[in-house]
Amino acid sequence: VMTSVAAKHAKGKKLKDVIFVTAGQALADAKENGRENVVNGTLGAIHDEDGNLVFLKTVKEEYLGLSDTEHIGYAPIAGVPEFLAAAEKECFGNSRPEGHIRSIATAGGTGGIHHLIHNYTEPGDEVLTADWYWGAYKVICSDIGRTLVTYSLFDEQNNFNHEAFKNRVNELAARQTNVVILFNTPGNNPTGYSIEDKDWDSILNFLKELVAIGRNNVIIGIDVAYLDFSGDREEVRGFFSKFGHLPKAILTCVCYSLSKGFTMYGQRVGAMIGISDDEEIADEFLEINKNTSRATWSNICRPAMRTMANIVADPVKFKAYEEERNSYYQLIRDRADIFKQEAAKVGLPMLPYRGGFFITIPTDSANAICEELKKEHVYVIALAKGIRVAACGIPKFQMTGLAEKIYNAMKRLGKL
């Protein structure tokens, strides 16, 4: 029996983060054998063609030029007001939904997901997401006494599986009042899949019918961490307008992040943006989440908020920023295209990639295959049902031939 003084709910907690562990192994290998000989497809961060972490110059310049007060001062608990306005503007683009919108600064996109689960479910409740999901969702749920449950994201044709989704939502709705559903789109981590507009229409029609019965509230959480790397600016944002004029029993919360789009991963800045047709529900959203912020991190990194606000407010700076960011989006797309074409050529199965940082190869033997690939200095992430490859971090010269390497490793192990 383990000696412990932890509270019952905390006993036995232990983080097994395969991503950071594998990333560490890749770095150690690169140190020993040279970076150009090691394929590091582990972390969700943009690296350039020389393997260096990218800090957008337009962002760096603005960040380093801030005054001391902006660099080290406290920020308001809800966030710097200019930042919140900029986050809404940049998140929604031309598709800002009609309705009452309230925003709160959060510790990256993760912080918003934490608050949403904490404040809109009861202890013991279940939270729903797709079976291809970012592992932190599960940790956030279990840490606060909730359970993450999943539906099959894809049907046989690799389209959104409406039947599986509806069945799962109905199961939850029968057991609990609030149904919290997390979507990670566009550019889902780990698959790169984006929910199409016609699928959103079906999803929302179904949820409207559900709340019309009068027993449930539905809280839609949308993690848009990869929004800026998933397609044409306005096209990928078009679906936001669908969240206006929904019944008041449906609350939408968009979890927006500066980590990827502004390359400020470790600064931990994002915003949770609530959308409701009912002003009281929108105001409640602001108050309860502000309170939880005070009780969790107190306030958010001021210089990163100010940097983003300044760039978005200045048309000249914003244009330069967008051009620079888009050049990296194009780079990631080119890398993904190399992999996609070569995978098709050798016959390596792959889930439908539309954008974002990652590509996924479905397999039940991810651990064994990833261990086999490490022998060839290839580091990718083993998931429960597949292998995640970070297109954001692998230079083109290393992306070339990678699909074949993975295919051959699977073949050697008899796992195709």
Residue ranges: model-predicted function:
Residues 4, 8, 16, 81, ...:
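PLP-dependent enzyme catalytic core of the Aspartate aminotransferase-like
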